[in-house]
Amino acid sequence: MKLSLLFLLFTWANVTIAQDIRIISDFESASIGSLKQVAPNEFKGQTMHWIKYDQIGNQYYWFYFKVINVKNKIASFELDNLKGVYRGGPHICFTDYTQPVISYDNESWARIEDVSYDEDKKIFRFSTYFEHDTAWIAYAHPYPYSRYMNYLESVKSSPYLNIIEEGRTPENRSIPLLEITNPGKKKDKKSILISAMQHSGEDAGGYSAEGIINFLLSDNIEAQKIRDEYVYYIVPVMNPDGVFHGVSRYTPKMQDLNDEWVREDTDEMDSPMEVEFLKNWIIDRYKNNNSIDLFIDIHCHLQRNLNIAFLDRSKETEALKELTELMRNYWPHVRYGHRYSPARLAVNFTAELNIPSLVVEFTQAYESDGDGNYLTIDDYRQFGEDMVKSITSFLNE
């Protein structure tokens, strides 16, 4: 009798433990502030809030965690305090059409559709049914640094791709600068420079950079002609340390790389290594009379229903409106706007080096064409390919 009772107690205890949902965030690019169980299969908490070193920024949107012991369960998650600070003003990222992503292998992702957002209280809720025991959940499709390194390894044998420069981060991660062209063709080619993921958490930019690279290296007839006539320089991941640690927007030193291209005498911190790497490369090019004909900086941190191409207010960039119009042929919801800050990468390149520069910010989630489609990794890659086609049409005019 005693043995039977002990056996029943042991079995009950193990079943109870097995049913407890576990939240894990100790892997690459993962991030969640606090997430506590408040009822069976119900969790409440906050995302990490990252405070900029000068205290005028508070970024919070990125989350990425793993759940275990969830098979055949419905679990709900509530995140509050979803309000930050951007350049001294309020920053709101979440909406009622924000849809996180879920994966059972950390590779293939689907949207979580059961979502709600309380705009007054800044609370975001979502719930989902789990088909397997382990799942990963993220704000948007993650693009970890290791994935980028593996991708680069898979394409670097191409005769058209060359790593011409390699910057380093404070944590000694590589920042490859890629050159893509046909080296056997003419030398006086127009040069295009593209950067992505200055801001960690803007992971769709990494996939769009893959789309650019995949197309330029392909056997497509148009791609072959582009390689003959142009040379592309691409930095797919400008902020590897921030990406690795799952930071929203900033580096682990809480610097916004896009605010660091012009330094003031009163700045308390040194210019980031990530910035100095690319800046020095461009300055060296100009010293050797090698210009850049076009620069594009890719951003994508919000899940909102529009894509914007930002220009500064200088006359030199007004012509780039034509490029945004060409992008409409592929992405009808692209529009252009204006922003000005001398410390921004694109603005600095225009003002200091007279490089025609464009900031392209596209959504990580919802398309605004009225059909309610949500973007996928393939869509991000297609965006990159279509951008190259738009650039070619623009420079050929």
Regions found by a protein language model. Name each.
Residues 3-13:
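Sec-dependent N-terminal signal peptides
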Residues 14-18:
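Sec/Tat signal peptide C-region and signal peptidase I cleavage site
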Residues 19-131, 135:
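Extreme N-terminal flexible tails
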Residues 45, 57, 269-277, 319, ...:
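Soluble or luminal CAZymes and related metallo-dependent hydrolases
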Residues 115-160, 164-167:
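Extended acidic/polar, glycine-enriched regions
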Residues 142, 256-258, 304-311, 339-397:
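Active-site-adjacent mobile loop/cap segments within catalytic or ligand-binding domains
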Residues 162-181, 186-337, 359-361, 366-372:
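Active-site/substrate-binding loop(s) of hydrolase catalytic cores
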